C-alpha cells in the first residue's frame, strides 16, 4: 500500500525448490532496482544471492545463515518460539501433554522442534512431536501446536467428531496468524510475527534504500482455544 502505482513489481514463486529458486535469481540479476527475496531454506543460502548488489537486496523471513552484509527482516524460529511458549506457561501448565505437529514435508525450520523439546524439559511437561494426523485422534487434556492452517482445520474437525470442545477439553495453538483464526470456534491462539510490520519495513527499504537488519519478535495472540 505504501508503494505508488508507478512501481512495477514482478512476483516470482519458487515453492521452496532450490533449482527453481536459483533459476529465478540467475535470470533476474541486473533486471531490477530492488530485490526482495525469501530464501528457499532457513539455513542454506544460494550462491546466486552473492551476485546481487547487497545494497539492492532485502532478505525476508528465513535467515539462519551468514547475512551480515545484507539487509534483512527475519523471524527467529528457535529462541523466539521458546519465548512465545513461555508467555503461555500459565495456560500450558493446565495440560498433561503438549504435542507439536510438524508435517514431514513442511519447510518450517526444524530448530523449532529443538526449542519445543527444551521448553517442555525446562517446565517438566510431557511432550511429543508428530508428523501426521492420519491415525491420530485428539484427546482431552492435551494441547496441540500446529504450523500449517490445513492442520489446524484437521485438528478442529477431529475434535468435533470426538465431541471435544476446543479451549475446554483440549488446547490448540496455531503458528502464523490469519483472519480465519479470529473466527474459528472462539478464536485460535496464535504465535506469529507481525506480518503487517514486515510489509511496512519492506516498503520502507524499497522506497529509501536505507539498510535494515531486524529480527521480528514472535508475538502471542491469546484467544479462546487455550
Question: Model regions: which residues?
Answer:
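An alpha-beta-alpha
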Residues: 82-123, 214-226
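Flexible loop/turn connectors
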Residues: 91, 139-143, 150-226
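A generic secondary-structure signal
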Residues: 2, 27, 87-91, 118-119, ...
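Alpha-helical recognition/docking segments in bacterial nutrient-uptake
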Residues: 1-83, 143, 150
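Short beta-strand elements in bilobed, periplasmic/extracellular small-molecule ligand-binding domains
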Residues: 3-15, 98-101, 113-137, 142-143
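Hydrophobic alpha-helical segments within soluble ligand-binding/sensing domains
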Residues: 63-99, 152, 191-211
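Short, aromatic/basic amphipathic alpha-helical patches
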Residues: 25, 46-52, 111-121, 155-159
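Short beta-strand/turn micro-motifs composed of small residues
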Residues: 37-39, 59-61, 74, 99-104, ...
Amino acid at each position: 500500500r505504501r508503494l505508488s502505482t508507478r512501481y512495477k513489481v514482478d512476483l516470482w514463486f519458487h515453492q521452496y525448490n532450490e533449482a527453481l529458486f536459483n533459476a529465478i535469481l540467475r535470470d533476474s540479476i541486473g533486471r531490477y532496482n530492488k530485490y526482495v527475496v525469501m530464501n528457499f531454506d532457513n539455513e542454506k543460502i544460494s550462491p546466486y544471492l552473492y551476485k546481487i548488489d547487497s545494497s539492492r537486496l532485502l532478505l525476508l523471513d528465513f535467515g539462519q545463515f551468514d547475512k551480515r552484509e545484507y539487509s534483512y527482516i527475519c523471524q527467529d524460529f528457535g529462541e523466539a518460539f521458546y519465548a512465545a511458549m513461555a508467555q503461555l506457561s500459565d495456560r500450558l501448565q493446565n495440560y498433561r501433554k503438549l504435542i507439536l505437529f510438524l508435517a514431514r514435508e513442511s519447510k518450517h525450520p526444524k530448530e523449532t522442534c529443538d526449542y519445543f523439546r527444551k521448553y517442555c524439559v525446562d517446565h517438566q511437561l510431557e511432550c511429543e512431536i508428530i508428523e501426521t494426523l492420519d491415525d491420530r485422534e485428539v484427546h482431552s487434556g492435551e494441547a496441540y501446536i500446529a504450523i500449517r492452517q490445513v492442520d489446524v482445520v484437521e485438528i478442529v474437525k477431529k475434535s468435533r467428531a470426538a465431541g471435544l470442545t476446543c479451549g475446554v477439553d483440549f488446547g490448540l495453538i496455531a503458528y502464523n496468524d490469519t483472519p480465519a483464526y479470529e473466527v474459528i470456534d472462539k478464536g485460535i491462539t496464535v504465535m506469529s510475527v507481525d506480518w503487517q510490520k514486515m510489509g511496512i519495513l519492506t516498503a520502507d527499504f524499497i522506497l529509501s534504500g536505507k539498510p535494515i537488519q531486524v529480527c521480528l519478535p514472535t508475538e502471542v495472540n491469546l484467544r479462546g482455544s487455550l
